Amino acid sequence: MRPLDAKKDHYRKMAREQGYRSRAAYKLKELNKAYRIIGAGFTVLDLGCAPGSWMQVAASAAGNRGTVLGVDLEYAEELNHAESMRGDVEDESLAETVAERLGRADAVICDLSPQVSGNWSVDHARQISLNYAAARIMGRVLAPKGNAVFKVFDGEYAAEFREHMGHMFSKTKSTKPQASRKQSSELYLVCLGFRG
């Protein structure tokens, strides 16, 4: 985003004023309001959590009885009822580490994005690949009837990923929150009712 555009960004300004770590908080707030992905007392796994705005929203939605564990390659500062750890979703041992630390999750939230190269085909394929890795972890820790949400770069592999997730959930829906920038290709795949 160009510096001039950032100054005009309504959600960025609100995030700063309301103490969120990034404007992405409003995407999850909107999704959770519409689909109730996270409820009071939920245990939540946040994959790709840095800088931590989704952890903030998840911790608030889960409340005092809830727990949030964020995982990212980068450090994300912990919060009340939210811990973070460094980890790579493509590391096959991460699922077991998360399961030992968290137990079963009621919701998995995933806002993963690769380091963008500027080559759309490469970036899209890489982002979808990260989602498949995250879905493997989700499959290990998500409780039956649990919910999930994944950021998806729209493109040639998005429908295939949605179909893959559709086999695991009672309902899936692709949506674009108003907090997403209009020019962004990101969509969010909401997945409800994990079949386990």
Curated annotation (Swiss-Prot):
<feature type="binding site">
    <location>
        <position position="54"/>
    </location>
    <ligand>
        <name>S-adenosyl-L-methionine</name>
    </ligand>
</feature>
<comment type="function">
    <text>Specifically methylates the uridine in position 2552 of 23S rRNA at the 2'-O position of the ribose in the fully assembled 50S ribosomal subunit.</text>
</comment>
<feature type="binding site">
    <location>
        <position position="72"/>
    </location>
    <ligand>
        <name>S-adenosyl-L-methionine</name>
    </ligand>
</feature>
<comment type="similarity">
    <text>Belongs to the class I-like SAM-binding methyltransferase superfamily. RNA methyltransferase RlmE family.</text>
</comment>
<keyword id="KW-0949">S-adenosyl-L-methionine</keyword>
<feature type="binding site">
    <location>
        <position position="88"/>
    </location>
    <ligand>
        <name>S-adenosyl-L-methionine</name>
    </ligand>
</feature>
<dbReference type="InterPro" id="IPR015507">
    <property type="entry name" value="rRNA-MeTfrase_E"/>
</dbReference>
<keyword id="KW-0698">rRNA processing</keyword>
<feature type="binding site">
    <location>
        <position position="52"/>
    </location>
    <ligand>
        <name>S-adenosyl-L-methionine</name>
    </ligand>
</feature>
<keyword id="KW-0808">Transferase</keyword>
<dbReference type="GO" id="GO:0005737">
    <property type="term" value="C:cytoplasm"/>
</dbReference>
<keyword id="KW-0489">Methyltransferase</keyword>
<dbReference type="InterPro" id="IPR050082">
    <property type="entry name" value="RNA_methyltr_RlmE"/>
</dbReference>
<dbReference type="GO" id="GO:0008650">
    <property type="term" value="F:rRNA (uridine-2'-O-)-methyltransferase activity"/>
</dbReference>
<protein>
    <recommendedName>
        <fullName>Ribosomal RNA large subunit methyltransferase E</fullName>
        <ecNumber>2.1.1.166</ecNumber>
    </recommendedName>
</protein>
<dbReference type="InterPro" id="IPR002877">
    <property type="entry name" value="RNA_MeTrfase_FtsJ_dom"/>
</dbReference>
<keyword id="KW-0963">Cytoplasm</keyword>
<dbReference type="Pfam" id="PF01728">
    <property type="entry name" value="FtsJ"/>
</dbReference>
<feature type="active site" description="Proton acceptor">
    <location>
        <position position="151"/>
    </location>
</feature>
<feature type="binding site">
    <location>
        <position position="111"/>
    </location>
    <ligand>
        <name>S-adenosyl-L-methionine</name>
    </ligand>
</feature>
<dbReference type="InterPro" id="IPR029063">
    <property type="entry name" value="SAM-dependent_MTases_sf"/>
</dbReference>
